[in-house]
């Protein structure tokens, strides 16, 4: 298993940040691996709710079925996924107040399937995943700190 942890300070309240990042329609706006999702609501996913996401990682396209495992607004959200190619992942978002904003942490633990993909992960995919995760949080900060995101991803 591979673990990638990234953190960023965002000048928005924790509830705003969590509401935005847990609404799947927003994922392609800030995460470079996210191509599309199969939902048409901008609402946060709650425990046991599911979404299918099309992703591209290391040049490989996959469809992942995500299931929410934990939802503690505005502090923590955990989602578990399984790709059609056999890979698995758990993503945990941790949020805490930081001044007038939020300390946001994204913790990704994933495993690819098959010996060939495991080798490619060590040689190639892991580096791309690390870079994509850094870029995702930079883009998230930029999107949420822009003036046009008020009201996006509000809880149901």
What are these regions (language model features)?
Residues 7-11, 38, 54, 67, ...:
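Generic structural detector for well-ordered beta-strands
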Residues 14-15, 42-45, 69-74, 94-103, ...:
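A short, structured loop/turn motif at beta-sheet edges
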Residues 49-56, 77-84:
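Short beta-strand segments that buttress and anchor functional surface loops
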Residues 39-40, 139-156:
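Short, highly charged C-terminal tails/helix-capping segments
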Residues 1-46, 155-156:
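Hydrophobic ligand-binding cavity/cleft-lining segments
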Residues 80-135, 151:
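Beta-strand/loop substructures that line and gate deep hydrophobic ligand-binding cavities in soluble
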């Amino acid at each position: 298993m591979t673990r990638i942890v990234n953190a960023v300070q965002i000048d928005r309240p924790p509830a705003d940040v969590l509401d935005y990042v847990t609404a799947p329609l927003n994922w392609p706006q800030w995460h470079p691996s996210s191509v599309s999702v199969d939902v048409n609501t901008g609402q946060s996913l709650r425990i046991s709710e599911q979404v299918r996401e099309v992703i591209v990682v290391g040049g490989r396209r996959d469809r992942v079925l995500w299931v929410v495992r934990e939802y503690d607004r505005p502090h923590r959200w955990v989602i578990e996924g399984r790709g059609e190619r056999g890979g698995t992942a758990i993503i945990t978002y941790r949020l805490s107040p930081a001044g007038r904003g939020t300390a946001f942490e994204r913790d990704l633990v994933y495993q690819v399937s098959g010996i060939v993909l495991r080798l490619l992960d060590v040689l190639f995919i892991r580096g791309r995943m690390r870079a994509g995760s850094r870029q995702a949080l930079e883009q998230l900060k930029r999107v949420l700190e822009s003036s046009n995101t008020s009201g996006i991803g509000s809880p149901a």
